[in-house]
């Protein structure tokens, strides 16, 4: 290369600053247990370990380096929680298999646990509970969080007319029992919300949550998860969706969200496991998206680059037409390798505020 050209290339390289890179702090999976997200049936301790060992032991050799630092048990039915229902599948509003033993299985290895309230199937139940007694629902959710020492996730997927007044009452009642904790030391204080992959789905919820609950100056919720779309959605499409949250969507009234207040998400399985689960990691969506996740710059909210991390839908058996992440379809070669590659901290540290 001619000397003049080499100096030009060097000058350009120096003039273009490297993108700031922030390691992920959240790396987890929603969990649907053995019975398609009802958590009604309690497994024996040995079966539960066989099914989930990959999550707490990425090398599958009993060295117990977890593949995740967060697991979210999905789902609690909102009306049953409001009424503290006890029936064949629930005890005081909580599914039977979301018990102290299941929580301890993960927490004893440094993995944070949360319970998710709602999900798409229970959208109408969210509507009913928020119209009936959102304050009691929020208080009961906080008491469950304290009882099991877990966080709570809000998964309310009313895309047309969400009851934001009721949801505000739910959150206020929760926070009256358990205040926001920036240190993360109190697991029960962790309160998060699910939003659409981008701002074009659940737009009203995104607009209200971003302005009222997810600011860096006066946070009420810890962060938001951008939910999955379809298993075969391209990484570039998902990055475009996530950018809608970060950049804001003015025509829909959605303000910018700090990257530090957002996780992205991928599928683990479709009709069969995919590379995010079984590997090879180099062929996975999470590998392709890692640079964006760790370097995306704030655009109107927050001061640090990089999203908070990644979530995956879903461990366990999410439905009758999809694979489960139980043997032989366990995910240590996908998520486990990624946890090492991304240097995921276990236990999860205090989350960056900006």
Which residues are covered by each model-predicted region?
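Conserved short secondary-structure transition element at the edge of the structured enzyme core
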Residues: 293-298
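Bacterial N-terminal signal peptides that target proteins for export
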Residues: 1-7
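Bacterial N-terminal signal peptides
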Residues: 7-17
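Chitinase-like catalytic core of GlcNAc-active glycosidases
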Residues: 21-292, 304-307, 313-348
